[in-house]
Structure formats: structure tokens, C-alpha cells
UniProtKB/Swiss-Prot annotation:
Species the sequence originates in: Gallus gallus
Gene: FEM1B
Subcellular localization, as worded in the UniProt entry: Cytoplasm; Nucleus
Name the record gives this protein: Protein fem-1 homolog B
Pathway the protein acts in: Protein modification; protein ubiquitination
Subunit annotation: Component of a CRL2 E3 ubiquitin-protein ligase complex, also named ECS (Elongin BC-CUL2/5-SOCS-box protein) complex.
Length: 627
């Protein structure tokens, strides 16, 4: 029956109404109920014949299922739309979201619930608003769809239509008394979403319907959001209509100009100067009431520059692009605040431009500043940390000097991020745990790249001591990847992933220098992963014993000299010697094996299954256990 259900689903999916009717012909009522209620799984989607037929716009199939077989319209499934996975979607939601008006009408006429919500509280009306189908939106509203139902983030139908740029839908919803000042969880209104996306006509429409200049959860008004997003026409419209005071006007013009200076998509240095100058004129418009700037203290990353305070100072840097770039970054940080989520992106962009021009020192200063801002705001920084490993690797590959103090700074931030990552994993819900673990593991690997880079950098004794302190700090936290591997396991493992953007020009594993450095900083040489393997178990399986003999030799010697037990068994009762995959590693291991009487005795106890628990000191029990 399951095989037949697959054929039924396929026929419904492809709109083959005659085939579907033939498959169901002369079937018992219970069989038909089973076949038409069967949930098929394809490409991450889970749906019934009715849902997939509605999703694909097969009107005749939907009519057959509803009128002849009385299929329940409230069946739910999991579907993909525009890259999003929608759980709990009905056939009506799918038809509305995919723009199949005839199917929508069929379903509604057969009693489909127009206000049924998905797991995230999305309605069919919201799906139609997302797609911009005014005809479907009108039909649903005329059939009692509630325009005020928001999704689980309190994001309304008006907000999604405003963000997606569907002017006619926005106008209709406002005419139906949708609240233009409703707030989402993040504090944003429809005006915020339209302003950020630069939809001028929608902004004009919302203002006409008395949308207020409200502040969102990040302290941003729609005017500020438009300025930060380089939407000059929206800024000028809001300045003309919003009745904002002089300070707000100045701030918006400054933020707009500053944003044009360091935006990858909207870079325009002429507009930077133009809007900064307009803001400066506004400050000095009334000689009796000049609005002075409250400037930030000088920041090293910005070349210790002080922001221009007079029209003359601004005029003096008009032809100096670099100065205008820095002016833009300073202005943004002053207006938005250092804890604003959007402050760091242009800093990173400007740093990347410096790196592309081989101006690595300035790049690193900016990226370190951005990293500190993001960590201060408790943001995920795995991409930022990896970016440093990439640029340091690029520098080494090009024989450019890398400063040990910069490596140490990034290592320190990595330790903090990995520690926070451990806490995030403990506090994370099951749905997001995969992403949290991915980011955490990425940071562990980045830390190893940075350690590897440090071994290829000129360091004074003091610098090396500082680097070692950060390595010690992380070893002390004992971070593990999914398979229970420690830093030392990954340092000796050829399967350790290496980022392929510059990093793999400099870093590779197994790595003898990284292994030695980790051991010098206190790494546990006999730590085991989830399978009971010690680092020694892993290195003896290295598949390049001849071409990379020195690495294999150095690591085995380092591990044994640090106290690695050559007779230690994993969960399969295999010693490193048993796990050796080549004659070379076997010979190297045998030449290093100096079994103590204590080890021989422990092995004998294990081999002959002699009872030892609660008969010897507890510290010895652990020792016997891993032999």
C-alpha cells in the first residue's frame, strides 16, 4: 500500500488527474482515506496529495480531491518556499503563497480555514502578502481573513508587504485599517521595514496614513534606518514630512553621508562629502544657536583622527578619500553607538579593501576594533576570527611580517569566544544546537590555525610567553569537538579540516610544531576521544609516512617524551601499535616503547580479567582501565 501511496502522490504532484482517478478507482473507503492522508517525504518536504497539488497549482486535481473524495482541507505538512522551511502549512497556505488564485478559491469554497496558522503563526494571508498577490489578498480578506494576525515574531502582514515592496498590497491593507504603528518583537514598524528596503512609494503611503517615527529595539527610527542603509531618497522624503527637530535632521544627514563612505553596494564618496557638508551647514545655520558636535575620543583603528567639527575642517579633507573613509567610520560609531549591530560591517569592509591593497597593518587595526565591538555586544565572531587566520596566512605566504602581538590579541579573543560558545551550547534549544556546535567547532579549528601561524612568526621571548599563556588558557578549558577530540588530537590528525582561503597555504595537519607547542603549554598527552583514542592512536595512522617522515617522527617522539602511554587501549582494546597502518609508524613506535613495570602489571590485570575495582587506590583504577 505504501508503494501505491507513492504513485498517488506523484500523480497529484504532477497534475495528472486521470491517472490519479484510475489509481483510486474501486478502492475501499479505508484505502482511499489512507492513500489521500499518506504523508510523503521528498527533498525535506512532507506533504499529502492535496497539499502538493495545491502547492503546484493543479486545480483539477484539487477539485477531484475536494469534491469527489471529500479530503480534509486542514491537513498540514512541511513545505519549502523561497528558501524557507514552513512547518504546519495547509493546502490553502501553499496555494496562497505560490499565487494559485483558482486553487485558493476552490479551497475556501470547500471550507478551508482562512486564518489557520503554521507553526510560526503564519496565515495564508501573510503568504499572499509575501508574494504580493493583491487579488488573493483581497479575496482572503473578503472571506474573513484577519489582517491583524502576526507571526511568532509579531511581524504583521503589513510589515512583510512593506518590506517586500508590494505597494498595492500595502495600500489595500491600510484601507482595511491595518495598524501602521504595530511593532514586531525587534521593535520595528512597517515604516522601518519599508525605509530599510528603500521602497519610497510605500514610505510615502505609510506617512500619509500617519505612520509614526518610532524607535526600534536598537534605538533606530525609520529615518535612521534609511540613512544607515544609504536610502537617500527615503531620508529626504522623511526629512520633509516627519517634522523632525534640528538634531535629528543633522544626525540623519551625517549618518547618510557616513554610510556612503564604507558601503560595498552603495559606495559614493561624493555623496559622503555632500551629506556631511549639508549636516555641517545645518549645525551652523543659526549663528546664535550653533549645535556643537560631541566627538568620540580618538580611536587607534581610525588613525587616532578627531572628527571634523567645523565646515572649514570638513572642507580641508574634501579631496582626501582616506580621511573621508575614516570620518565615515567615526561618525557612524558616534551616532549608532559602539554596541549597535550594524556598526562593525563597514569597518570590516574598509579593512578588506586595505587588505586587497596590501595595506595589512591598517586592515588588522580595523578588524581588531570590529572584533572587540562584536565581542562586547556578545555577537557570534567565528567568521571574524577565521578572517584573521586567513589574512595572517596571506601575509606569511607573501613574506609580509605578522606581529606577534596581533596574533596574541586574536588568540585571546578566540579563547573568550570558545568559552562563550561552550555556554551557548548548554543554553541553546534543540532547534539551534547544530548551528551553535558548528560555530564552536569552527572557532576551535581557527584557534589551531592561529597557533600554527604563530610558529611561523618571529617572536621575542616576551611575545612567545604571551601567546603561550593564551594557549594554556584554552587547554585549561578543555574544549572538545563532537567526536570528543581535544586540541592535541586535531593537531596530530590528518583529517583536521583546513580553511581553503589562504589558510591552507600556511597551515596543515598533522603538525609537529603545533603538537610540541600544545604539549609545552600543558596539553594532556593521554586524553582520549569518544572512541578511547589518544593522540598517539591517531598519529600512527598517518597515511604519508615516507613523504612526510619528519612530521611523523617528530610527533611520535614529542608525544612519547611527554608521557604518552604506548600500551594504552581504546574502546576496541587496541593499542597505538595495533592501530599502526604502516610499517614506518610501527617501527618508530617500537623504538620509542619503554614499558614500565607499572604498565606491564596493568596490562596483565586487563588481559587476564583480574578483578581490581575497590581493591586498589582509585587513582590506580583509572590507570588500569585505559590499559
Amino acid at each position: 500500500m505504501e508503494g501505491l501511496a507513492g504513485y498517488v502522490y506523484k500523480a497529484a504532484s504532477e497534475g495528472r488527474v486521470l491517472t490519479l482517478a484510475a489509481l483510486l478507482l474501486n478502492r475501499s473507503e479505508s484505502d482511499i482515506k489512507y492513500l489521500l492522508g499518506y504523508v510523503s517525504q521528498h527533498g525535506g518536504q512532507r506533504s499529502t496529495p492535496l497539499i502538493i497539488a495545491a502547492r503546484n497549482g493543479h486545480t483539477k486535481v484539487v477539485r477531484l480531491l475536494l469534491e469527489h473524495y471529500r479530503v480534509q482541507t486542514q491537513q498540514t505538512g512541511t513545505v519549502r518556499f523561497d528558501g524557507f522551511v514552513i512547518d504546519g502549512a495547509t493546502a490553502l497556505w501553499c496555494a496562497a503563497g505560490a499565487g494559485h488564485f483558482e486553487v485558493v478559491k476552490l479551497l475556501v469554497s470547500h471550507g478551508a480555514n482562512v486564518n489557520h496558522t503554521t507553526v510560526t503563526n503564519s496565515t495564508p494571508l501573510r503568504a499572499a502578502c509575501f508574494d504580493g498577490r493583491l487579488d488573493i489578498v483581497k479575496y482572503l480578506v473578503e472571506n474573513n481573513a484577519n489582517i491583524s494576525i502576526a507571526n511568532k515574531y509579531d511581524n504583521t502582514c503589513l510589515m512583510i508587504a512593506a518590506y517586500k515592496g508590494h505597494t498595492d498590497v500595502v495600500r489595500y491593507l491600510l484601507e482595511q485599517h491595518a495598524d501602521p504603528n504595530a511593532k514586531a518583537h525587534c521593535g520595528a514598524t512597517a515604516l522601518h521595514f519599508a525605509a530599510e528596503a528603500g521602497h519610497l512609494e510605500i514610505v510615502r503611503e505609510l506617512v500619509k496614513w500617519k505612520a509614526a517615527m518610532m524607535v526600534n529595539g536598537h534605538g533606530m527610527t525609520p529615518l535612521k534606518v534609511a540613512a544607515e542603509s544609504c536610502k537617500a531618497d527615503v531620508v529626504e522624503l522623511l526629512l520633509a514630512h516627519a517634522g523632525c527637530n534640528r538634531r535629528s535632521r543633522i544626525e540623519a544627514l551625517e549618518l547618510l553621508g557616513a554610510s556612503f563612505a564604507n558601503d560595498r553596494e552603495n559606495y559614493d564618496i561624493m555623496k559622503t562629502y555632500h551629506y556631511l557638508y549639508l549636516a555641517m551647514l545645518e549645525r551652523y545655520r543659526d549663528s546664535e544657536n550653533i549645535i556643537e558636535k560631541e566627538v568620540l575620543p580618538p580611536i587607534e583603528a581610525y588613525g587616532n583622527r578627531t572628527e571634523c567639527r567645523t565646515p572649514q575642517e570638513l572642507e580641508s579633507i574634501r579631496q582626501d578619500r582616506d580621511a573621508l573613509h575614516m570620518e565615515g567610520l567615526i561618525v557612524r560609531e558616534r551616532i549608532l553607538g559602539s554596541d549597535n549591530i550594524d556598526v562593525s560591517h563597514p569597518i570590516i569592509y574598509r579593512g578588506a579593501v586595505y587588505a586587497d591593497n596590501m595595506e595589512f597593518e591598517q586592515c588588522i587595526k580595523l578588524w581588531l576594533h570590529a572584533l572587540h565591538l562584536r565581542q562586547k555586544g556578545n555577537r557570534n565572531t567565528h567568521k571574524d576570527l577565521l578572517r584573521f587566520a586567513q589574512v595572517f596566512s596571506q601575509m606569511i605566504h607573501l613574506n609580509e611580517p605578522v606581529k606577534a602581538k596581533d596574533i596574541e590579541s586574536v588568540l585571546r579573543c578566540s579563547v573568550l569566544e570558545i568559552e562563550q560558545g561552550m555556554s551557548r551550547i548548554k543554553a541553546t534549544q534543540d532547534d539551534d544546537i547544530h548551528t551553535a556546535v558548528d560555530n564552536y567547532e569552527c572557532n576551535i579549528f581557527t584557534f589551531l590555525y592561529l597557533v600554527c601561524i604563530s610558529t611561523k612568526t618571529q617572536c621575542s621571548e616576551e611575545d612567545q610567553s604571551r601567546i603561550n599563556k593564551q594557549i594554556y588558557n584554552l587547554i585549561h578549558l578543555d574544549p572538545r569537538t563532537r567526536d570528543g577530540s581535544t586540541l592535541l588530537h586535531h593537531a596530530v590528525n590528518s583529517s583536521t579540516p583546513v580553511d581553503d582561503f589562504h589558510t591552507n597555504d600556511v597551515c596543515s595537519f598533522p603538525n609537529a610544531l603545533v603538537t610540541k607547542l600544545l604539549l609545552d603549554c600543558g596539553a594532556d598527552v593521554n586524553a582520549v576521544d569518544n572512541e578511547g583514542n589518544s593522540p598517539l592512536h591517531l598519529i600512527v595512522q598517518y597515511h604519508r609516512p615516507i613523504s612526510d617522515f619528519l612530521t611523523l617522527h617528530s610527533i611520535i617522539i614529542s608525544l612519547v617524551e611527554a608521557g604518552a602511554h604506548t600500551d594504552m587501549t581504546n574502546k576496541q582494546k587496541k593499542t597505538p601499535l595495533d592501530k599502526s597502518t604502516t610499517g614506518v609508524s610501527e617501527i618508530l613506535l617500537k623504538t620509542q616503547m619503554k614499558l614500565s613495570l607499572k604498565c606491564l602489571a596493568a596490562r596483565a590485570v586487563r588481559i587476564y580479567n583480574i578483578s581490581y575495582q575497590n581493591q586498589i587506590p582509585r587513582t590506580l583504577e583509572e590507570f588500569v582501565k585505559f590499559h
